[in-house]
């Protein structure tokens, strides 16, 4: 019996020693952000909104989020005082005060007890910060089946607190996934095509044809893009791949496969559809440099840099693992790779070499979208 007690005691001491070796994260929720400082906002499992100080390349503060995690898409308010997060399994948007982590806003997309409505990454904040837009996909839940309903654009007032209800609602096209608000008050949203929407009456026009483009000697483009980055240069960019044929016969055996981007400048409304290179690998996200708009950077299994006008791959950097998001600091000389696991990889925009790493407390970032901003 004595030996058994010694074994139990030894096991208990061993467990305590192991637990004491684990990192202890202090409560940083009340740390106010500093004016003029640059930060990176990102989310990760199980319930974290992380604010990174890009000068020290460390976690500045962590806010706790309610509900089920996912997808964790982040959008920063124009005054840089609030972070909005798409959460609870795509069903709600939360608005957090960045200084105190206080939950100040909550919009639930479902509008009835027997309805389930989810937004597939599709929400945005107006340029004056007063309204939040979302296209969500409702279903009616019966006892033995679901009925798919018309997608809808919901408009919320960001001043309506924790029980925000739509102040306007309009039918929307199907398959809308990401969106950004423009300086002229309109809303651009990506679906089968990229649409320009009047948020007062719900009417829309095609700003950039995608599925329905009519480019000579091109096949239909393919688009997979779920990460709405708020960029310093006011670009709303989406990557595509497409076959480019040698002649009107459209022979796939002789076609070149091109990578390109659709772009809307949210300040001017100017649109662009442009190839930037051959398809040699797959990228989940890409951004043009804020320092040199002729340079395109892409990431998934490698980090790459392209000369857009020459349609030439300039550099490629091997990575420790897959990353989904590439984004710049405001100066355009550093790149942050986020998504998938719980580490942020930092790279030189000039050489693409890895120059740092940030380990996040908690679990994986998964398919979150990060944002860089100056307070």
Name the predicted role of every residue range.
Residues 4-5, 19-21:
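Low-complexity, intrinsically disordered short peptide segments enriched in small/polar/basic residues
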Residues 10-20:
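Bacterial N-terminal signal peptides
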């Amino acid at each position: 019996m004595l030996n058994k007690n010694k074994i139990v005691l030894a096991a208990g001491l061993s467990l305590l020693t192991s637990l004491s070796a684990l990192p202890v994260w202090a409560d940083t929720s009340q740390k106010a952000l500093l004016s003029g400082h640059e930060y990176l906002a990102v989310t990760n499992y199980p319930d974290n909104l992380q604010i990174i100080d890009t000068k020290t390349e460390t976690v500045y503060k962590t806010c706790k989020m309610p509900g089920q995690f996912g997808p964790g898409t982040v959008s920063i308010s124009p005054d840089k005082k609030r972070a909005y997060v798409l959460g609870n399994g795509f069903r709600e948007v939360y608005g957090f005060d960045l200084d105190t982590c206080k939950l100040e806003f909550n919009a639930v997309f479902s509008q009835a007890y027997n309805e389930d409505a989810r937004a597939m990454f599709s929400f945005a904040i107006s340029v004056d910060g007063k309204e939040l837009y979302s296209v969500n996909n409702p279903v009616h839940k019966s006892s033995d089946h679901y009925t798919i309903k018309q997608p809808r654009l919901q408009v919320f007032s960001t001043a309506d607190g924790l029980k925000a209800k739509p102040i306007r609602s309009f039918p929307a096209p199907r398959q809308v996934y990401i969106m950004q608000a423009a300086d002229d008050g309109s809303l651009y949203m990506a679906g089968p095509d990229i649409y320009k929407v009047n948020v007062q009456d719900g009417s829309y026009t095609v700003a950039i044809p995608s599925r329905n483009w009519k480019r000579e000697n091109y096949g239909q483009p393919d688009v997979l893009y779920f990460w709405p980055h708020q960029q310093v240069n006011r670009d709303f960019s989406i990557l595509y791949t497409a076959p480019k044929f040698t002649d009107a016969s459209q022979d796939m055996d002789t076609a070149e496969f091109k990578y390109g981007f659709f772009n809307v400048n949210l300040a001017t409304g100017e649109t662009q559809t442009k190839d930037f290179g051959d398809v040699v690998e797959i990228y989940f996200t890409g951004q043009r440099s804020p320092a040199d708009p002729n340079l395109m950077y892409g990431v998934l299994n490698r980090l790459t840099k392209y000369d857009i006008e020459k349609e030439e791959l300039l550099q490629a950097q091997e990575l420790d693992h897959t990353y989904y998001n590439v984004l710049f600091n405001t100066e355009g000389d550093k790149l942050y790779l986020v998504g998938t696991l719980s580490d942020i990889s930092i790279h030189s925009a000039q050489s693409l070499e890895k120059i740092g790493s940030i380990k996040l407390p908690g679990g994986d970032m998964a398919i979150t979208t990060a944002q860089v901003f100056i307070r």
